[in-house]
Amino acid sequence: MVKSHIGSWILVLFVAMWSDVGLCKKRPKPGGGWNTGGSRYPGQGSPGGNRYPPQGGGGWGQPHGGGWGQPHGGGWGQPHGGGWGQPHGGGGWGQGGSHSQWNKPSKPKTNMKHMAGAAAAGAVVGGLGGYMLGSAMSRPLIHFGNDYEDRYYRENMYRYPNQVYYRPVDQYSNQNNFVHDCVNITVKQHTVTTTTKGENFTETDMKIMERVVEQMCVTQYQKESEAYYQRRASAILFSSPPVILLISFLIFLIVG
């Protein structure tokens, strides 16, 4: 019996405390902001007065109406009413006048599409009608069938190109067309560049260079065609309905 009475009193006490807390939350606060008697912002009429008193009637440690440590009505560390670090009132930080930082022109944003386009265009050689320059290769070891040309190649291989010019493989019907075009443009471009430097190629040079460049163009074709077919296979795989359904289901599981 005693235990039941004690439980009832505890329940009544808990309800009373809860009701008192709810009334305290709903009860309106008198006046304005924190530790003030009226409006939170100056200039808004209120029977309780303003949060920031007029000049001449400052709060604790305010000789001239400013905030704490404010000799002339400014913000903290503001000697003359400006923003922080503003000696004579006015605009934004470090500005002595009335011009706001909002009036400054915004910096132009970098367009990501333009950046991506510039990066993609970097692989295309300017002035060569869409030809691309392949990565540097080690010059192949080739035997020409006679000791003179073999020795000549070993002694002069630095004069021959180690990169080739080419178009995308999907623009050609077979390897022979790709290699033929690759050899012609690479030899022509290298010959023109070398001639402008004051060097000339002999008939032996041209014969050896065409053979070397042909081998490099074959290597370039194999590399490019492999990458091309891998891209096509990936596109076909990810465009198939079962894969799309599976990806959609996984996204649903992650998001949901």
Curated annotation (Swiss-Prot):
Compositional bias (Gly residues): 55-97
Keyword Glycoprotein attributed: yes
Major localization class: membrane
UniProt keyword terms in alphabetical order: Amyloid, Cell membrane, Copper, Disulfide bond, Glycoprotein, Golgi apparatus, GPI-anchor, Lipoprotein, Membrane, Metal-binding, Prion, Repeat, Signal, Zinc
Disulfide bond entries: 182-217
Oligomeric form and interacting partners: Monomer and homodimer. Has a tendency to aggregate into amyloid fibrils containing a cross-beta spine, formed by a steric zipper of superposed beta-strands. Soluble oligomers may represent an intermediate stage on the path to fibril formation. Copper binding may promote oligomerization. Interacts with GRB2, APP, ERI3/PRNPIP and SYN1. Mislocalized cytosolically exposed PrP interacts with MGRN1; this interaction alters MGRN1 subcellular location and causes lysosomal enlargement. Interacts with APP. Interacts with KIAA1191. Interacts with ADGRG6.
Disease: PrP is found in high quantity in the brain of humans and animals infected with the degenerative neurological diseases kuru, Creutzfeldt-Jakob disease (CJD), Gerstmann-Straussler syndrome (GSS), scrapie, bovine spongiform encephalopathy (BSE), transmissible mink encephalopathy (TME), etc.
Protein name per Swiss-Prot or TrEMBL: Major prion protein
Origin species: Felis catus
